[in-house]
From Swiss-Prot:
<dbReference type="GO" id="GO:0009254">
    <property type="term" value="P:peptidoglycan turnover"/>
</dbReference>
<dbReference type="GO" id="GO:0016773">
    <property type="term" value="F:phosphotransferase activity, alcohol group as acceptor"/>
</dbReference>
<comment type="similarity">
    <text>Belongs to the anhydro-N-acetylmuramic acid kinase family.</text>
</comment>
<keyword id="KW-0119">Carbohydrate metabolism</keyword>
<keyword id="KW-0808">Transferase</keyword>
<dbReference type="InterPro" id="IPR043129">
    <property type="entry name" value="ATPase_NBD"/>
</dbReference>
<dbReference type="Pfam" id="PF03702">
    <property type="entry name" value="AnmK"/>
</dbReference>
<dbReference type="GO" id="GO:0016301">
    <property type="term" value="F:kinase activity"/>
</dbReference>
<keyword id="KW-0547">Nucleotide-binding</keyword>
<protein>
    <recommendedName>
        <fullName>Anhydro-N-acetylmuramic acid kinase</fullName>
        <ecNumber>2.7.1.170</ecNumber>
    </recommendedName>
</protein>
<comment type="function">
    <text>Catalyzes the specific phosphorylation of 1,6-anhydro-N-acetylmuramic acid (anhMurNAc) with the simultaneous cleavage of the 1,6-anhydro ring, generating MurNAc-6-P. Is required for the utilization of anhMurNAc either imported from the medium or derived from its own cell wall murein, and thus plays a role in cell wall recycling.</text>
</comment>
<keyword id="KW-0418">Kinase</keyword>
<dbReference type="InterPro" id="IPR005338">
    <property type="entry name" value="Anhydro_N_Ac-Mur_kinase"/>
</dbReference>
<dbReference type="GO" id="GO:0005524">
    <property type="term" value="F:ATP binding"/>
</dbReference>
<keyword id="KW-0067">ATP-binding</keyword>
<comment type="pathway">
    <text>Amino-sugar metabolism; 1,6-anhydro-N-acetylmuramate degradation.</text>
</comment>
<dbReference type="GO" id="GO:0006040">
    <property type="term" value="P:amino sugar metabolic process"/>
</dbReference>
């Protein structure tokens, strides 16, 4: 019998749009009990961004130096309204009564992440007041800034959720999220959890594919599979000093953007498919290098995020990680498409339960902190 069969607990709704800005993931979650250590996905949906707004978000995320305050204020409002619309669509499609949902956890859209600036800052837009207003549901948002205020990176935040859901294993595990940026959670049988960003993943692959193949992403890795890895370019990309930094570390599109990759090519005239293959290999290499260096005893790598649907990328990861099983998080009951949205529902639930949800060993914060700000219905 499922542990959820007779559970009549409140639902939580998570909203997430990542570095790739390919859509808003919305997930309705139910927890087995008040510990929030078991959860099920009740319903999920992904709502594509309106093309012009997505173009604006990608440009903002890539580090445009000057943005008019009026324009930014309008984008913040537009993103909030889009998040509210995604939540309302999921509620309508699921048939769940609005009163059953205790809170929405909204990540927002990151437009700048500067954890190493002085003073450090991170900025996610998507007006949470509008989400609360247009859904009629209490909304929790702004999860990252308290960790940054406490001296942390503000990212990644998902390792705490991964630990809660997957931390009872009898083997050394890793959870790999392949979103716009890759990030790893290392969960040893004994010892402290470690989590960090690994570098670019879908963000670069999508951008290059859009520019040279005319499609927003490389379906099943076919474009990359048609090319060959350029060893010189791969080494030039991996020579970026960021890859050698020890955890805690985090990054974003403002650092690993298409111009960064083009600059590494120099004057070389490379076939577009070969560049795509090399960018895919960069993702596999940066993940594998970090995993083999920091937890070589890993037996199982559970993959989530958009990259789980790229069999070429998964095959390259498996080839670089001999002796490790590389598989989808779905095997453990966690839908890879909605795992991050589920995580932000969990973060909202943890704040309302009065529990700290950052892992100082992961982010570098001075200590445990309550994450998020509450916007009442």
């Amino acid at each position: 019998m499922s542990v959820f069969e007779h559970v009549d607990s409140p639902l939580y709704l998570g909203l997430m749009s990542g570095t790739s800005a390919d859509g808003i993931d919305a997930a309705l979650v139910r927890f087995a009990d008040a510990t929030h250590r078991r959860c099920e996905l009740v319903a999920g949906t992904t709502v594509a961004w309106e093309p012009q707004l997505r173009e604006t978000l990608v440009a903002l995320g890539q580090g445009a130096e000057t943005v008019a305050i009026d324009a930014l204020g309008q984008v913040d409002a537009q993103v909030g309204l889009a998040f509210a619309a995604a939540a309302n669509r999921l509620i309508g499609d699921s048939g769940v009564e609005r009163r059953q949902i205790r809170a929405i956890g909204s990540h927002g859209q990151t437009i700048r992440h500067r954890p190493n600036a002085n003073p450090a800052f991170t900025w996610q837009i998507g007006d949470a007041s509008r989400i609360a207003e247009h859904t009629g549901i209490t909304t929790v948002a702004d999860f990252r800034r308290r960790d940054v205020a406490a001296g942390g990176q503000g990212a990644p935040l998902m390792p705490a959720f991964h630990l809660a859901m997957l931390g009872a294993g009898d083997e050394d595990r890793a959870v790999l999220n392949l979103g716009g940026i890759g990030n790893l959670t290392l969960i040893p049988r004994d010892g402290a959890v470690l989590g960090f960003d690994t570098g670019p993943a879908n963000a670069l692959l999508d951008s290059w594919c859009q520019r040279h193949h005319g499609t927003p992403f490389d379906a099943e890795g076919a474009f990359a599979a048609s090319g060959r890895v350029d060893a010189v370019l791969l080494q030039a990309l991996l020579a970026d000093p960021w890859f050698a930094l020890p955890p805690p570390k985090s990054t974003g599109r403002e650092q690993f953007h298409l111009d960064w990759a083009v600059q590494a090519m120099g004057s070389a005239r490379l076939d577009a498919a070969d560049v795509q293959a090399t960018l895919l290999e960069l993702t596999a290499a940066s993940v594998a290098d970090a995993l083999l260096r920091l937890q070589p005893t890993t037996r199982r790598v559970l993959v989530c995020g958009g990259g789980v649907r790229n069999p070429v990328l998964l095959a390259r990861l498996a080839a670089r990680l001999p002796g490790m099983v590389v598989e989808s998080s779905a095997r453990y009951g966690l839908d890879p498409d909605y795992l991050e949205a589920m995580g932000f529902a969990w973060l909202a639930a943890e704040l309302l339960a009065g529990r700290a949800a950052n892992l100082p060993a992961v982010t570098g914060a001075a200590g445990p902190r309550l994450l998020g700000a509450i916007y009442p219905a």
